[in-house]
Amino acid sequence: MLKLTIAQLNVTVGDIEGNVEKMVSAARQAWDHGSDLVVFSELSLSGYYPGDLLEEPSFMRRVEQGLDALLQASRQLRNLHWVVGAPVVRGGPGKRLHNMLLVIKAGEIVLRYAKQLLPTYNVFDERRHFEPGPDVAKVLRIGEAQVGFLICEDGWNDEGADYAVNPFERMRDAAPDLVVSINASPSNIGKREQRHQIFGAASRRHGLPLLYVNQIGGHDQLVYDGASFAVEPNAGVVFEAQRFVEDVTTLRFDGSRFAALSSDELPKVSVHGLSTLAFYQAQIVLGLKDYARRCGFRRAVVGSSGGIDSALTLALAVQALGENYVAAVTMPSHYSSAGSVDDSITLCRNLGIELTPHPIADLVSGYARQFELSFGEPLRGLALENLQARVRGTVLMEYSNSFGNLLLTTGNKSEISVGYCTLYGDTNGGLGLIGDLYKTEVFALSRYVNVSSGRELIPTAIIDKPPSAELAPDQKDTDSLPPYPVLDEVLKLQIEGERLAPQEREHARSFVGQLQATAEGGALIARVRQMIARNEYKRRQAPPIIRVRARAFGTGRQMPIAAKYL
C-alpha cells in the first residue's frame, strides 16, 4: 500500500525561494498524512515556463540553491520521496539543460529522469532551451511498488506520430505498478476532457495505473487549471483534484486501485466538467488575479464606454480583484450617446465600483485645431475618429501612471482579428481579458455573468444595443464589418481551423462552405482573410491576452508582418 500526495500548487516563475516555501509546506502536509510520495508539477522549482531566464547564469544558480534547500528540508522528512520538476545543467554536446524530474529522499537525489519529448508548437518552445533525454524508462521501488516516471509531453504522444519515440511504450516494457506523470499543462476549452481521453486511453492500452499532477495559476497569457487526476486501466479517471485552486490531496494505492485517504470511496468524477461559459469565467478571473498579483498591481482601471466589451471586462475584473480595487472612467465625446453614459452609470452602480467622468470633447477639439495650425490640413475621417480613441487611451495611461492601476484593454478576438481597433488608443494597457473571446461569445458570457450572479450586473440595455465604437455620427460596427455571427464563423476556421473542437469545426466548415458558394459570400471571406493578414502589426504591439481557446493570438500564433501570402 502506497500513500501518494498530489501537490497541485500555484508556483511563480522565477520565485525560487517562494516556490521552495510552498513545496516544503506541501511536503509537510504529506508527511502528516503518512505519505510515501509527494508529487509536484513540471518545473515546479523554477515555475513553468521560464523562457530565456534559463539562459541567465544567475537564475540557474538560484535554481541550484533552491534544490539544495529542498534536499536539506527532505532530511527532516526522511521516509518521504519528493518528486520535483526542475531545469538541470547537463554536460556534452547539444543544449546545456534538461527538463528534469528528480526524486529526492532524505537529502539525496535517488532518481533522475530527463524529459524526452520537447514540445515546440502552439505556445510551447522547449527545444529552444532543453536537450531531449535518452530513450529509457526510469522506475524506482518505493515500498512494495515499482513506480515509473514521465514528464507531460512524454505521455501525450502515445499512439501519436509527432515524435520518433514513445516513452509510454518504454514504460510498459519496464512494467511498473504505477506511472507518475508531472505536468505543466495550460488550459483551454476542452483541454481537461482531452487529457482524460489521452491518458485514459494510454492507461488502458498499456495496463498501467497513472497519477497525473498539474500546476495551477496564471502566467502571462497562459492559465493552468490544475485538475490533477488518477487513472485506472479498467475504470478510467477515478479521481480529480480541484480546478483553478491549489489542492494538496493524499490518496492510497494498493497496487491496482486508488482510494481516498480515509475511506475506500472516491468522489465521482464528472465527465463534462464546467460548461464553456463557466470555464471562460473561471479561466479569465484566475488569469487576471495572478497577473495582477505577480506584477505588483492591487487595482485595475477600465475605460467604460457603455458598450458590452468594457462592461464584461469590468464585471470580470470585479470578480477577480474585488469592487474596491476596480475603477472605471467614462470619456464621452461629441458622438457619445446619452444612453451610453447612462448605461455606464448603471453598470458601475450594479458592480459597486467608482465611475469617474472625464469628457474628451475639448481635448479632441484642441488637438485637431493645433494639428491644422501646424500642418495646414484639418483632421478628417478615420484620422479624426482614431484621435478620439487615442485621446481616451492617453487619459487612461495617465490615470494608470498617476494612481498605479493596471489598465485593462477591452478588445475582443473578432475585433483584434480584423484590426477593428486603434493602435495607441483602445489597444493601450497591460492585459486584455476578453481578447480570446469572439464577439458572439462576449454576448453569451455577459448573459452568463448575470445568470450566475443571480442578478443583473451588466444592464440588459448594454447587452441588447447594437455594437458601436461611437467615433462618428450614428456609427455601427456593421458599417465596417460583417455581422458578428457571420464574421466569427469565418474567423474561427481561418485562425483556429483544425484546433477547433470537432463539433465547432464541423459547424464552422458547413457555415463557411455555404457562404463560399455565393459570389458575395466568397468576396466576404476573401476580404476577412486580407483584414486578418494586414493587421498582424497591430496584434504584435498589443498587450498580452488571457488565452481560453486552443489557438490564441500571441505566442500561439506566430505570423510575419512584412510578407505577402494571400
Where on the chain are the PLM-derived regions?
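Enzyme catalytic cores with a strong preference for nitrogen-chemistry domains
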Residues: 1-303, 314-323, 330, 355
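ATP/NTP-dependent adenylation/nucleotidyl-transfer catalytic domains that generate, transfer
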Residues: 3, 207-208, 233, 263-305, ...
